[in-house]
Structure formats: C-alpha cells, structure tokens
C-alpha cells in the first residue's frame, strides 16, 4: 500500500515529525525519521521502516491515527521549524535543535 504525504510538521527539540498522509484513508502519523518526507512524497510502509524512491529507510513510527482537523491545526500552530525569521538569514535560530541535517537547508 502506498502512502502520500499531504503535509509535515517537525519538532526539532525532540526530532519527531508528524505527517498528514493519504493511504486507504487520511491519517496522521507520528514518527522519528531518518529522512524528511516532504508534501507530495510517496512511500510504502514496511516492517523495518519505509520504501521511498526505491530505497529502504528505517523510521520509528510511534502512532498512526485517523486524521483529525483540530489535532492537525494544533500541531501546525505549535510548529517550531522552520522559524519564520530564518527565511531571511538562511540560519537556524533554534538553539536546541537535534536534527543533524536541516530539511529546510538552514545552517
């Protein structure tokens, strides 16, 4: 079964990502990724992680829940990454980020 990423929220202090996805139904997944799944990404879940662009990547999925508009709005409103001011300077101003490679290309 293929899943399509609709939107993704990253919490840089804990390295957790939340993605709204479409599979058999619209869902929210909470996971610790080894890659950043951008909107429009298509992947297949497997026992050890996911297959994305014909390559297997390990990820830890913590929870999958049916999509809930209010929950997704809450996640989006608490999004810390990327901070808006970083777009001007191209530098990440989030001092406690644990993500090794910024998915937004910030330094």
UniProtKB/Swiss-Prot annotation:
Superkingdom in the source lineage: Bacteria
Gene: iraM
Listed NCBIfam families: PRK09919.1
Disulfide-bond pairs as recorded: none
Similarity comment: Belongs to the IraM/RssC family.
CC annotations in GO: cytoplasm
GO BP: cellular response to starvation
Compartments, record wording: Cytoplasm
Keywords: Cytoplasm, Stress response
Protein name in UniProt: Anti-adapter protein IraM
Protein's organism: Escherichia coli O17:K52:H18 (strain UMN026 / ExPEC)
Function (record text): Inhibits RpoS proteolysis by regulating RssB activity, thereby increasing the stability of the sigma stress factor RpoS during magnesium starvation.
Database matches in InterPro entries: Anti-adapter_IraM, PmrD_sf
The keyword Cytoplasm is annotated on this UniProt entry: yes
